[in-house]
Amino acid sequence: IEVNARLSRSSALASKATGYPLAFVAAKLGMGYGLFELKNSVTKTTSAFFEPALDYVVCKIPRWDLSKFHGVDRELGSSMKSVGEVMAIGRNFEEAIQKGLRMIGQGMHGYVENKELNIENIDESLQEPTDKRIFVISKAMHKGYTIDQIHDLTKIDKWFLQKLKHIIDIDEKLRKCTSVNVLDKYLLREAKVYGFTDFQIARAVGLEEEIHNMYKAGLVIRNLRKNYGI
């Protein structure tokens, strides 16, 4: 990340994400020890002279509590307005971002299948960086906005937009299932691999409207997964 004599928030995140004890190792190095002399805190036998190898993706998302303060400007800029952050881990970016969005305390179920946002002008909402903009992007993609259009309005890198569009594509395939009975195991497995919860799947196939109970709807999908061995 960078070379300095202190432990920053970024290096603390890197330590949590990799499982490598940066603070402990940095303190020992400052005392004159070499990396080859320090023991790996996990194995207790090998040295700390190794590079962590990750087979997962870590996503850090700031948490804002702007709704608690009346009249506050929701636009985000260079001044820090976040009151904390969440760290989500997944085998792919789609899974990690959906997990993170569920944890930021805005009452969302992930990137898709959330409560409907009342947006008067999608273009303006995409241009203004706010704590809700990622959900505006989700709505825009459902409305048919292309990756290039959203990139021009938000200036967000297309790699991230392509990953978010992948979640939308899976959601659209789920919505084409008229009932849970036509939901095949391959689509169900794909949805679970990319971070969809049982409730998100249930809402996408219209099961929540049929049962009128979100918890029971999620349990139906859970039992279906068990039958499929997923």
What are these regions (language model features)?
Residues 1-195, 219:
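ATP-dependent carboxylate activation and anion-phosphoryl transfer catalytic cores
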